[in-house]
Amino acid sequence: MKKISVVIKEAVENAFISLGYDKKYGMVSISNRPDLCQYQCNGAMAAVKEYKKAPLVIACEVADKLQLSEEGKIFEKIEAVKPGFINLTLKDEFLADYVNEMGGNDNFGYEAEGNPRKIVIDYGGPNVAKPLHIGHLRSAIIGESIKRTERFAGNEVIGDVHLGDWGLQMGLIITELKHRNPELVYFDESFTGEYPSEAPFTMGELEEIYPAASARSKEDEEYKNEALHATALLQSGNRGYLALWNHILSVSVADLKKNYENLNVSFDLWKKESDAQPFIPDMVEKMKADGFAHTSEGALVVDVAREDDKKEVPPCIILKSDGASLYSTTDLATIVERVKLFNPTDILYVVDKRQEMHFEQVFRTAKKTGIAPEELNLTFLGFGTMNGKDGKPFKTREGGVMRLERLIAEITEEVEAKMADREMDEETKHTVARQVGLAALKYGDLSNQAGKDYIFDLDRFASFEGNTGPYIQYTVVRIRSILDKFIAEKGITKAELDKFFADKKLVKSVTESERNLELVIAKFSDMIDLAATEFAPHKVCAYIYEAANCFSAFYHENHILTEQDEARKYSLLKLSYITEKIIVKCLDLLGIDAPERM
C-alpha cells in the first residue's frame, strides 16, 4: 500500500512533469498551517531560478493542471496562493477509504522501500559483576526501541549487549577473592582436576567484592600491581583464573538477563569484549604490514586527523607501550568479528554522547585500515544524560548512583499510590502499576531526542495527563472500554471484532475531530519510515501523542455508541478500533505494554 505522502506527491509531480517542469519540484509536505490546508507544495518557489517565471505563475499552472487530472480527484481543494504555495486538502471520501484500507492490511499497509538492511545494534554495554544502574537505562531502552522499529520496517536486526568482561576489573575481583578465600582450589597452581561447577559466590557478593577491590587498589599500590598481574595471568590463559572468570560471567549474565527482562529488553547476542580478543593479533599485524600503524612515544597508533577537522582528533592508540590493548583495540576487533560473522550493512552504537571522540577515532581507523568495508555504515548514536530536577546527573537521595531495579520499584510505588481508589485486587493493581510505571519511565526517556539531556521528573512522567506514557496507555484503555461495551451489545467476542469490521467501511467524516484523527492515522507509514531512517524513537512518541490527543477530541465530539445512523456508528467504531491497534503497535515499538485496565 502506497504511503499517503507518496500518493499525494506523485499526483503533484505528474502535474509538474506534464507542464515541462522537473519532477523534483513536486515535493509535498504536511502543512504548517492546518487552518488553511492539509498538505502543501513549495516547489514553485524553488523552480523560479531554473525556469525564469514568477513563482505564483508556476503554482497556478500546476494547480490548474492538477485540478483537471485523474490523480487530482483525491483533492477537495487545490489552491495556488502568494508567493507561490500550492495548498492541498484531501477529499473526505478518499481519506476514509485510505484509512479503511489500512485497517484491513497487515502492518496497517506499511511496505518497506528498497532492499532490507542488515543492522547490528550495539546497546546495553554493562560490565559483568556490577548491578545495572540508571546509567544503563538509556542505552537499553533506546536500543530496544530502534531494534523493534527497524524490524517492523523490514530490516534484519541483530541486537548485541556487548558485555564488558575483560580487563582490570576481572583482575581486581580475582585478587580480592584470593585475599578473602586463599584456600579456593582456583588459586592452587598444582591442581589439575575439574573445577567446581558451582560458583564460589552469589551475585550479591560479587556486587560487594568489586567496589571493595576497586577502592583498595586506589590506596594500595601493591594490591593494584597484584590485580594487574592477575589480569595478565587471566588473559594469558591461567586455568584457575579462567574458571573463576567463567563463574563471574555465568552469575552476572543470569542476573543481567533477569533485570533486562524486567525492563522488557532483550538481546539476540550476549557477546563480550573477550570474544574479540582472538581477532586482535592478526588485526594489529595487518595494520603494521600495511603501513597504517606506527610507534609514537612507545605506543602503537594510527593517525586519523584530517585537514578539514574543526577540532583536534588525536591518533587512535592500538596498543599501549607495554603491549596491552585498550577499548579502542577491542572495539576495532569487534568490528572485524561482526563483519566476519554477519557482513552487516550497518553497525549502530547506542552509547553515551561523551564517547563521541572515542568512536570517531575508532570509525576513522576502521575505514582507513580497511577493517570496515567502504559500504559499511558505522553510526554513533550518542545519548544525553538523565538529570535530576537540579539539572545534575540523577542520583539517589543519599547522593549515590541509583540501581535500576530500585528506580523501577520507586516508580511502581508512585503509580500504585495514584491507583489507590481503583476497584481491582491487589495483585492486579500491582501488575498494572508496574506496566504503567515502566511506561512512565520509558516514554519519559524516549519522547526526548536521544542526543539531548533531559530532566527526570517522576511526578510529571507518572501523570495520567499530558505527553506521558500513562496518558497514551489510558487512551488505549478508554478505546477498549468502548469496544467492550459494543461487544456486549452485539453479543460477539473480542476475537470476532476483526471479522465483524472486515466488511464495514469508514464513511465520509462529518466532524472536524473525525477528519483530524483519520489524517493522523493515515501518516503511520510515513512516521515509521522517518523513525527507522533516523533511528529516532521520539518520532514514534510524537506520533502516538498526536493520535491520542486527536482521539480524545474525537471521543468528546462524536456519540460513538449512541449514534443512530448504523453505517456511521460502525464507521466511528471501526475508526476507534484501527486507532487502538495502531497505538498498541507503536507502544510495542517503544517496548511498552498496553494494560487492559488502569
Pin down the residues of each PLM region.
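Flexible, low-complexity linker/hinge segments
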Residues: 104-113
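Non-catalytic interaction-recognition regions
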Residues: 1-96, 113-598
